[in-house]
Design a protein with these regions (language model features):
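Short amphipathic alpha-helical segments
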Residues: 20-22, 44, 118-122, 137-138, ...
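Phosphate-coordination loops involved in phosphoryl transfer and adenosine-cofactor binding
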Residues: 4-6, 79-80, 176, 248
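Beta1-alpha1 glycine-rich phosphate/pyrophosphate-binding loop at the start
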Residues: 3-73, 133-158, 174, 233
Length: 269
C-alpha cells in the first residue's frame, strides 16, 4: 500500500489535530497517522477547564471535536504505527505497519509522555488513577490529604513553591523516599514505599480504593528512529526555528515533541 499526500502528520494529539485542521482547510491532501488512539494523552483527563473559549470539557470530548473538524475539511486518519521515516529527498516517505505513505511535507507531532519512575505495577495501573501532577497543592482541591514522596533531601523546584507545600496543612512530605510498588487487582488498593537512607519500608493500604498515585517525574519525547537525521537536543526534543521548521526542508515539528517550557493543550496547538 503506497499513497501520495501533500502532508503527513505523525501523531494524533492536540498538536497533530490542530495541524490537520489548518492543512486540510487550506486544501492540502492531509493524512494523520496515530499509533494508539486519536487525541493523545489528554484523552484520559476527565476535566479540562483552561482551554480558551471552552468553560469545561473532557480531554476526550475536546480532541474528538478537533478530529471531526479536521475530517470535515477532508483530513484522513490512519491508526498505524510509524516505523521508519525517509526525509532527505523532495518526496518524504513514512513506513508504517500498514504500508508506506509519501508526502511533500511531514509534521512531527508525536508528543512527549510522562517519564516512568520504575516501581512495580507502574505500567499495569497507568491510566487507572495515574497522571502527571504539576504540584501537590492543586491536588488538595480534590483530596482530603496528599503525601509527597521526594527522593532527595529537599525539593528541587523554586523555593517559594516548596515553602508553600511544606506549610500546607493537607500535605505531608516524606524526604529520601521512593515508591517501590503499587497493586490491588482491578483497582489501586495499596502502595509500598521505602526510606532510601534507612531502608525502612511502609505499606499503605485502603479497603475502599479511595486513593490515587500521581507521578510527576518529568517527560520524555516520543520519536526514536522516526527522528533520524533531525536535530534534537540532549534530551531528544526536536529543534525547530520560529516557524517550527526542522533542519530538513519540508519537515516541521509541532507540540510537546519540540523544545518548550510549558506543556499544555493550548501550547501544543
Amino acid at each position: 500500500m503506497e499513497r501520495m499526500y501533500d502532508v503527513i502528520i505523525i501523531g494524533g494529539g492536540p498538536a497533530g489535530l490542530a495541524a490537520a485542521v489548518y492543512m486540510a482547510r487550506a486544501q492540502y491532501k492531509t493524512l494523520v497517522i496515530e499509533k494508539e488512539k486519536i487525541g493523545g494523552l489528554i484523552t484520559i483527563t476527565s476535566e479540562v477547564v483552561n482551554y480558551p473559549g471552552v468553560i469545561k470539557t473532557s480531554g476526550k470530548e475536546l480532541t474528538e471535536q478537533m478530529r471531526l473538524q479536521a475530517e470535515s475539511f477532508g483530513a484522513e486518519f490512519l491508526l498505524a504505527e510509524a516505523l521508519e521515516s525517509r526525509l532527505d529527498g523532495e518526496i518524504k516517505e513514512i513506513v508504517t505497519d500498514k504500508g508506506t505513505f509519501k508526502a511533500l511535507g511531514v509534521i512531527m507531532a508525536m508528543g512527549a509522555v510522562p517519564r516512568q519512575v520504575g516501581f512495580t505495577g507502574e505500567a499495569e495501573y497507568r491510566g487507572r488513577g495515574f497522571a502527571a501532577a504539576e504540584e501537590a497543592i492543586f491536588l488538595t482541591r480534590y483530596a482530603r490529604h496528599v503525601t509527597v514522596l521526594v527522593r532527595g533531601d529537599d525539593f528541587t523546584c523554586a523555593g517559594s513553591i516548596a515553602d508553600e507545600v511544606k506549610r500546607h496543612e493537607q500535605i505531608t512530605v516524606l524526604y529520601n523516599t521512593a515508591l517501590l510498588e503499587v497493586g490491588g487487582g482491578d483497582v489501586l488498593r495499596y502502595a509500598v514505599y521505602e526510606n532510601c537512607k534507612t531502608g525502612e519500608r511502609t505499606r499503605y493500604e485502603t479497603p475502599d480504593a479511595t486513593f490515587g498515585v500521581f507521578v510527576f517525574a518529568g517527560y520524555v519525547p516520543v520519536g526514536g528512529p522516526l527522528l533520524e537525521g533531525l536535530e534534537t537536543d540532549c534530551e531528544g526534543y526536536l529543534v525547530t526555528d520560529m516557524n517550527q521548521k526542522t533542519n530538513l526542508d519540508g519537515v516541521y515539528g509541532a507540540g510537546d515533541l519540540c523544545i518548550k517550557n510549558l506543556r499544555q493543550v493550548v501550547t501544543a496547538v
